[in-house]
């Protein structure tokens, strides 16, 4: 065992011991002993030395269910804190820096060696356009209150690592840890009520306030340092390689709770939050910048003030206060904005820039490059609107709205027209100067909501909004329809209208749709920037399995790159990835480097899912590491793109995809018992009842195809079968080996980043899958006639593991990554009891109707949250 593993185990042991003390104080020694017995039984079960755990949990009294679930949930959260702390800070002086810290300096050296000049490198880095789009997520059940306590626990782990602590100081740290853990234990960790979209948006703002606000300027300092050491050039002040957008409060696809009024409220809350955060910065800077010497340009603004910097910052502070007050008042109803209210980001940036330039001009660069520079970087990155809010709606809602309008106008039903007639009508109306809608038109509620959303977009400042994303887009008319609805609402500025291609068929059709759109007269002239296209990962994987979906996504991107190049239009690909492999998730750095050549081009946009936001961006140090990885990967994919795949690789990938989709659909669609087995063996039915997010877990009606991708993945993840992430690969790879293509598979894995990344992610998810746990759910929950199907699926899981081991030449999955393996093993100690307890709770819940606020249902929700926390990339 390495020293780093030992220290992690020591931290986990300490935190667990302190939690045990807290539990003993509330529930007594006998209850704590029961927890210990369950933990030891879980270890024995995993070693195959006994099967006591299920019977122990089955004997639990009703009143013990919730505290037992809470105990193991808290153990897992504390283990996660220790692990995250280790990933950021733990390194002996003789050990190399972690990869995340080295990745950019090493890349810049490689780029220079490959012939890229200093000026070109600096120019490309400064021009990078990386947009991370924060999305709400039903499985992110951790409350903001607890997240803040967990951050404080991480800070105390850092404090106890100081080597010069005297015993009394070390004891103080331990007492603070004990108090924080007690506070966390006595705080209810789950919501009793479903969060609203506004709650979700506030959660996203809290991540910015508590982590990204600090992480972004720290990250940019390191980027600037790496660039200067490599090229002698600095990162320009106006450069913001990574910016943030959000779907929280803008994503109304399938969520009737996200209304035009909600979107307006979230936009105002973002402005309030931005003003409040910058006020804190300005208060600090005004206290610091007491200097008297100033440049002529600054003096022109403030006259002969004895404290010119403070005088200028006071003007900005007054305007920020006015902005905050206006945003707060506007939440109650529309308010006129005075001239003092800040609307243009330049009005925020310019005073800070003037102070910065003046300090440098007066020989005080060391002061300029301190907290002032950090505030300036924040102003450029976050601005007055904090994040750009995307709007997302289903294409069918726009078609229905236009059908009602054309029907009212006596033109027939838009939905009944063919594509050519739709395009002809839309193009004519887009050029028409008269309104399409008469003033007295009274639409039905759903159409009225679509039109109200468009009016909110037209009324909002351009810099507060990102893209209008059309889910389930399938034709060029879907894009023009939104453009027309926005025009009718009074939008006169350009806004990116983005088709989202999601299913396997839609991905295959993405090229022809964009070819048609870009070929329409006048369309390209109205772009005002790159053509953005969104690639959906979740629904395509649910539709066809990850083997076929991954290849369809790759081919769709290749086609889009080619078509945009032919039309001389720049392309921005927006990747709709989930947190899990089954929804396109996985390590971002490897995923970006595995994109088709030419598909990145200095621009990259991706969703960051709720439960992964906390793990990737919840602590400033972790956030910095992930920002480094994104920036380095996009720069490398832009300047050192991978070569196109060899014809033989493409041919084999075609075959793998065909075999994979056939095997996947053979189980998921063609087996008449599959849906019933899924509903019995996983908590899928219960997930819809639990208060896990503002969006319903199901679309309106139907079977598996009606399920949203998140509960589909989430149900399988909770039982550790992880089926959506691997089903289909076992057959596809086995068939290739049977055809004698082992050498070709090895070559693809060695030389083709796309294929290597797929296999690496498959291996990672197989290492987290657990047939023993999945079987325990079956034994407790599934009717005897369906048990053979469960056994068959576990056989397929075993086959997947064996074929991946054969492909990688290892004896154990993840043998090449012992640290990851250690993290998984460490968490299994606490996960195993939660899984077994969840199966017991599901069995009890299904045998009777339990109220949502009953201890049984509350305990079930805690197990869902705990397993999600333990497995990280959950749903």
UniProtKB/Swiss-Prot annotation:
Which reactions appear under catalytic activity for this entry?
oxaloacetate + phosphate = phosphoenolpyruvate + hydrogencarbonate
Which residues constitute the catalytic centre? 137, 542
Which Gene3D superfamilies is this protein grouped with?
A: Phosphoenolpyruvate/pyruvate domain
Q: Which GO terms describe its molecular function?
A: magnesium ion binding; phosphoenolpyruvate carboxylase activity
Query: Which InterPro entries does its entry note?
Result: PEP_COase, PEP_COase_bac/pln-type, PEP_COase_Lys_AS, PEPCASE_His_AS, Pyrv/PenolPyrv_kinase-like_dom
Keyword Magnesium listed? The answer is yes
Q: Which domain of life is it from?
A: Bacteria
Pfam families of this UniProt entry?
PEPcase (PF00311)
The cofactors it requires, by name, are: Mg(2+)
Q: Does the keyword Cell membrane apply?
A: no
The alphabetized UniProt keywords are: Carbon dioxide fixation, Lyase, Magnesium
- GO CC aspect terms: cytosol
Which BP terms does GO give this entry?
A: carbon fixation; oxaloacetate metabolic process; tricarboxylic acid cycle
EC number annotated for this UniProt entry: 4.1.1.31
Q: Which HAMAP family match?
A: PEPcase_type1
Report the function annotation for this chain.
Forms oxaloacetate, a four-carbon dicarboxylic acid source for the tricarboxylic acid cycle.
Family the UniProt entry places it in:
Belongs to the PEPCase type 1 family.
Name listed for the protein in its UniProt record: Phosphoenolpyruvate carboxylase
Species in which this protein is naturally found: Pseudomonas entomophila (strain L48)
- Annotated gene: ppc
């Amino acid at each position: 065992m390495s020293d780093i593993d030992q220290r992690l185990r020591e931290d986990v042991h300490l935190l667990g011991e302190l939690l045990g003390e807290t539990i003993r104080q509330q529930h007594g020694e006998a209850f704590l002993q029961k927890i210990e017995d369950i933990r030891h039984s879980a270890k024995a079960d995993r070693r195959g030395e006994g099967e006591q755990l299920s019977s122990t949990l089955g004997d639990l009294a009703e009143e013990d269910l919730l505290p037992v679930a809470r105990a193991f949930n808290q153990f897992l959260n504390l283990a996660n804190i220790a692990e995250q702390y280790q990933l950021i800070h733990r390194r002996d002086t003789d050990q190399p820096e972690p990869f995340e810290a080295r990745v950019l300096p090493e890349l810049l050296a490689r780029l220079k060696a490959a012939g890229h000049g200093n000026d070109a490198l600096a120019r490309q880095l400064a021009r990078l356009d990386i947009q991370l789009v924060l999305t709400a997520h039903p499985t992110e059940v951790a409350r903001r209150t607890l997240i803040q306590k967990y951050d404080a626990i991480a800070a105390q782990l850092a404090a106890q690592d100081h080597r010069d602590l005297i015993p009394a100081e070390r004891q103080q740290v331990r007492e603070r840890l004990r108090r924080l853990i007690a506070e966390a234990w006595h705080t209810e960790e789950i919501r009793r009520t479903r969060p609203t979209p506004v709650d979700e948006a506030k959660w996203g703002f809290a991540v910015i306030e508590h982590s990204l606000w600090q992480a972004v300027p720290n990250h940019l300092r390191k980027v600037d340092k790496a660039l200067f050491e490599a090229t002698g050039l600095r990162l320009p002040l106006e450069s913001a390689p990574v910016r943030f957008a959000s779907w929280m409060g803008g994503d109304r696809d399938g969520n009737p709770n996200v209304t035009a009024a909600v979107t307006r409220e979230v936009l105002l809350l973002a402005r309030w939050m931005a003003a409040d955060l910058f006020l804190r910065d300005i208060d600090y800077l005004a206290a610091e910048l007491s200097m008297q010497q100033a440049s002529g340009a600054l003096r022109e603004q403030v006259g002969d003030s004895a404290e010119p910097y403070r005088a200028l910052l006071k003007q900005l502070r007054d305007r920020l206060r006015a902005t905050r007050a206006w945003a707060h008042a506007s939440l109650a109803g529309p308010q006129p904005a005075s001239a003092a209210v800040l609307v243009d980001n330049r009005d925020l940036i310019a005073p800070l820039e003037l102070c910065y330039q003046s300090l440098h001009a007066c020989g005080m660069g060391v002061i300029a490059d301190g907290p002032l520079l950090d505030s300036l970087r924040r102003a450029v990155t976050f601005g007055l609107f904090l994040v750009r809010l995307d709007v997302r709606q289903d294409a069918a809602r726009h078609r229905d709205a236009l059908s009602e309008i054309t029907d009212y106008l006596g033109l027939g039903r838009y939905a009944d027209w063919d594509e050519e007639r739709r395009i002809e009508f839309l193009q004519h109306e887009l050029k028409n100067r008269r309104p399409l809608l008469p003033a007295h038109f009274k639409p039905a509620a759903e159409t009225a909501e679509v039109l109200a959303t468009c009016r909110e977009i037209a009324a909002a400042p351009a810099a507060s909004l990102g893209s209008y994303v059309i889910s389930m887009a399938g034709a060029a008319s879907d894009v023009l329809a939104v453009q027309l609805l926005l025009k009718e609402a009074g939008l006169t500025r350009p806004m990116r209208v983005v088709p989202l291609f999601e299913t396997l068929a839609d991905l295959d059709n993405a090229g022809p749709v964009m070819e048609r759109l870009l070929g329409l007269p006048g369309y390209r002239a109205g772009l005002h920037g790159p053509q953005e296209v969104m690639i959906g990962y979740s629904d395509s994987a649910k539709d066809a399995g990850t083997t076929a979906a991954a290849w369809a996504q790759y081919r769709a991107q290749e086609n889009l790159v080619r078509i945009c190049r032919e039309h001389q239009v720049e392309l921005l690909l927006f990747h709709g990835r989930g947190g899990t492999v089954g929804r396109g998730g996985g390590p971002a750095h490897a995923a970006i480097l595995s994109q088709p050549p030419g598909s990145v081009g200095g621009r990259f946009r991706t969703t960051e899912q709720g439960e992964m936001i906390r793990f990737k961006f919840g602590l400033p140090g972790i956030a910095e590491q992930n920002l480094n990885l994104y920036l380095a990967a996009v720069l490398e994919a832009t300047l050192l793109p991978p070569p196109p795949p060899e014809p033989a690789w493409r041919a084999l990938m075609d075959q793998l995809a065909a075999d994979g989709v056939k095997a996947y659909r053979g189980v998921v669609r063609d087996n008449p018992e599959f849906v019933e087995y899924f509903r019995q063996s996983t908590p899928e039915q219960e997930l819809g009842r639990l208060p896990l997010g503002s969006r319903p877990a199901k679309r309106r009606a139907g079977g598996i195809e009606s399920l949203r991708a998140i509960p589909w993945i989430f149900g399988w993840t909770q039982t550790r079968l992880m089926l959506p992430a691997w089903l289909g690969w076992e057959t596809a790879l086995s068939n290739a080996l049977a055809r004698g293509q082992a050498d070709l598979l090895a070559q693809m894995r060695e030389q083709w980043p796309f294929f290597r990344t797929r296999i690496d992610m498959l291996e990672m998810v197989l290492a987290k899958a657990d047939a023993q746990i999945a079987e325990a759910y079956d034994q407790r929950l599934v009717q005897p006639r369906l048990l053979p199907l469960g056994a068959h699926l576990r056989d397929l899981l075993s086959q997947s593991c064996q074929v991946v081991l054969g492909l990688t030449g290892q004896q154990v999955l993840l043998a090449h990554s012992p640290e990851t393996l250690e993290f998984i093993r460490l968490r299994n100690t606490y996960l195993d009891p939660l899984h077994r307890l969840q199966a017991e709770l599901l069995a009890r819940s299904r045998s009777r109707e339990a109220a949502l606020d009953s201890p049984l249902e509350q305990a079930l929700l805690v197990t869902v949250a705990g397993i999600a926390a333990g497995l990280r990339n959950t749903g």
